[in-house]
Amino acid sequence: MSTITIHTDGACSGNPGPGGWGAILEWNGHRKELKGGEADTTNNRMEMMAAIQALEALRKADRSVILITDSVYLRDGITKWIHGWKKRGWKTADKKPVKNVDLWQRLDELTRSHTIDWRWVKGHAGDPGNERADELAREGLAEARGRQP
């Protein structure tokens, strides 16, 4: 089974405001680029949407995935915090509702289908995959901004 490498990024103009997400999937010499955006969102939601859309694009289950993000929120949320949230009925340690619970639940479901190595990379530091994912996210943001009333 070959490993699929995914680079993701999100962008937002204002927080909240229009936002975009970008993802690159690479496997066996192939490459697929994805992007999208929303007219009213947050940076964290766009970081999460990039990962969700990339994982949803995988056609088969049981994939070995390396997912590279510059979002500590995304990486720590899915690898550390989510276990406690689920035990507490999607509440934080101080008993408040988890923000972005709709996306965390989607991501949780998607992670069950694959073996995922979640990795963090410093944003805007020259990593080619992160830089391209950022470009895609900004394109998604521009498209979302164009759809605003």
Curated annotation (Swiss-Prot):
Keywords: Cytoplasm, Endonuclease, Hydrolase, Magnesium, Metal-binding, Nuclease. Its EC number is 3.1.26.4. Belongs to the RNase H family. InterPro entries: RNase_H, RNaseH-like_sf, RNaseH_domain, RNaseH_sf, RNaseHI. This is Ribonuclease H. Mg(2+) 1 binds at residues 9, 47, 70. The keyword Acyltransferase does not apply.
